[in-house]
């Protein structure tokens, strides 16, 4: 991927590309080992009520936004994302160790979540580094990013079933220590194999900047992605408890459902990346929203394991297109601001968690877990309204 003699090009190209793929997978697996079981961990191990579970997700998202915005400002100013990613991996590993051995709700919320926020920021910083690397080496950024996103989805194929197997078959301690190992290996890979890409002084920015262009459309896209990720967060928080406590189905089904959706997301992301220039990002996002609408209607009606698994195709289209195209949409609306654009996109995920944590906790506390899917349906309808007003790029 570097400009080098022909004889050396294949080796350099393969090494750098493989390193990015492995790091994308490892950052994905570290998250996929923790997030799917977190609501069950808080309920069964920490003994938190539904409202406290929702508040935990909300607080986690708020702290995550503060941390990621701070790191985005430093990364766009300093430009050396490699050391920053390694630093994030180290703190992510420490967070996993804390969750493995501690069961105090407030220690986990204020210290564990603070450390976890740095760990989760390793992923968007890796994508920002990949975008800059693709731009400087002339690689097709859309397809390269889609392939990396597919690696994260591959991690989510393996991660949720493995997380449930480790947590239910052994213990949550074993599960979190496994995630810590993933962070350690990821940090080593980044340090030795990813390129350092310092920015020149004229390109440096003093703070995390607002979009220089397309501000209205960037705001609309922020709302759209926030609502879409919010529905997905509602699903992740609520679905395992809904499956176990209301449908009385096996615990492992929740992990299989998440893994199935992630597996189907991989071809969805690659296809979306291929057709992004031909069909436009806006049309692809519209397709995703329609699939999401059908999915959440299905979740309100379905109760059989086979039907729940079949619905994951719609979920995969919904999240696969959002995950593969949403970040690129931000980057195209904010040219020259790769770090800020990527972090802004990532913060739509975190704001989605804020909304979802509050709604899931309140709905489950007052009504039941099934009622949460009605809130998701309303958010999908609001997304359609916003999507009709944004321009294509």
Curated annotation (Swiss-Prot):
GO molecular function term, any single one: carbohydrate:proton symporter activity
Subcellular location: Cell inner membrane
Membrane topology (UniProt): Multi-pass membrane protein
Pfam families on file: MFS_1 (PF07690)
InterPro entries given in the database record: MFS (IPR011701), MFS_dom (IPR020846), MFS_trans_sf (IPR036259), Sugar_efflux (IPR004750)
GO BP: cellular response to glucose-phosphate stress; D-glucose transmembrane transport; lactose transport
Record carries keyword Mitochondrion: no
Annotated TM spans: 13-33, 52-72, 84-101, 105-124, 152-172, 174-194, 219-239, 253-273, 283-303, 308-328, 344-364, 366-386
Alphabetic keyword roster: Cell inner membrane, Cell membrane, Membrane, Sugar transport, Transmembrane, Transmembrane helix, Transport
Annotated disulfide bonds: none
GO CC list: plasma membrane
Keyword Transmembrane helix: yes
Family affiliation: Belongs to the major facilitator superfamily. Set transporter family.
Biological role stated in the UniProt entry: Involved in the efflux of sugars. The physiological role may be the detoxification of non-metabolizable sugar analogs. Can transport lactose and glucose.
Protein name per its UniProtKB record: Sugar efflux transporter B
Source organism: Salmonella typhimurium (strain LT2 / SGSC1412 / ATCC 700720)
Lineage: Bacteria, Pseudomonadati, Pseudomonadota, Gammaproteobacteria, Enterobacterales
């Amino acid at each position: 991927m570097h400009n080098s003699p022909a004889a050396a090009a294949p080796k350099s190209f393969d090494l750098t590309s493989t390193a990015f793929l492995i790091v994308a997978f490892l950052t994905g697996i570290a998250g996929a080992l923790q997030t799917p079981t977190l609501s069950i961990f808080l309920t069964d191990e920490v003994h938190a009520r539904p409202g406290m579970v929702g508040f935990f997700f909300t607080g986690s998202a708020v702290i995550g936004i503060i941390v990621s915005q701070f790191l985005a400002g430093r990364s766009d100013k300093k430009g050396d994302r490699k050391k920053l990613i390694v630093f994030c991996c180290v703190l992510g590993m420490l967070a996993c160790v804390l969750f493995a051995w501690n069961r105090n709700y407030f220690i986990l919320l204020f210290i564990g979540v603070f450390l976890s926020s740095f760990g989760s920021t390793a992923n968007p910083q890796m994508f920002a580094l990949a975008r800059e690397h693709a731009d400087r080496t002339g690689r097709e950024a859309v397809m390269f990013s889609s392939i990396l996103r597919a690696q994260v989805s591959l991690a989510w194929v393996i991660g949720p079933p493995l997380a449930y197997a480790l947590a239910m078959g052994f213990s949550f301690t074993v599960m979190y220590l496994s995630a810590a190992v993933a962070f350690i290996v990821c940090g080593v890979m980044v340090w030795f194999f990813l390129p350092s890409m310092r920015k020149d002084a004229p390109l440096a920015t003093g703070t995390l900047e607002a979009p220089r262009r397309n501000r209205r459309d960037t705001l609309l896209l922020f709302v759209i992605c926030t609502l879409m990720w919010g529905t997905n967060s509602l699903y992740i928080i609520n679905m395992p408890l809904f499956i176990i406590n209301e449908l009385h189905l096996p615990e492992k089904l929740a992990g299989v459902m998440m893994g199935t959706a992630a597996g189907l997301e991989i071809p969805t992301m690659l296809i979306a990346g291929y057709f992004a220039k031909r069909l436009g990002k806006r049309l692809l996002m519209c397709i995703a929203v329609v699939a999401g609408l059908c999915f959440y209607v299905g979740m309100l009606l379905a109760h059989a394991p086979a039907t729940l698994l079949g619905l994951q195709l719609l979920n995969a289209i919904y999240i696969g297109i959002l995950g593969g195209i949403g970040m690129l949409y931000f980057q195209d609306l904010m040219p020259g601001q790769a770090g800020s654009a990527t972090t802004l996109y990532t913060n739509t995920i975190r704001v989605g968690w804020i909304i979802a944590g509050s709604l899931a906790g309140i709905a489950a506390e007052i009504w039941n877990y099934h009622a949460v899917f009605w809130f998701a349906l309303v958010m999908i309808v609001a997304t359609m309204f916003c999507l009709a007003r944004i321009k294509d790029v």
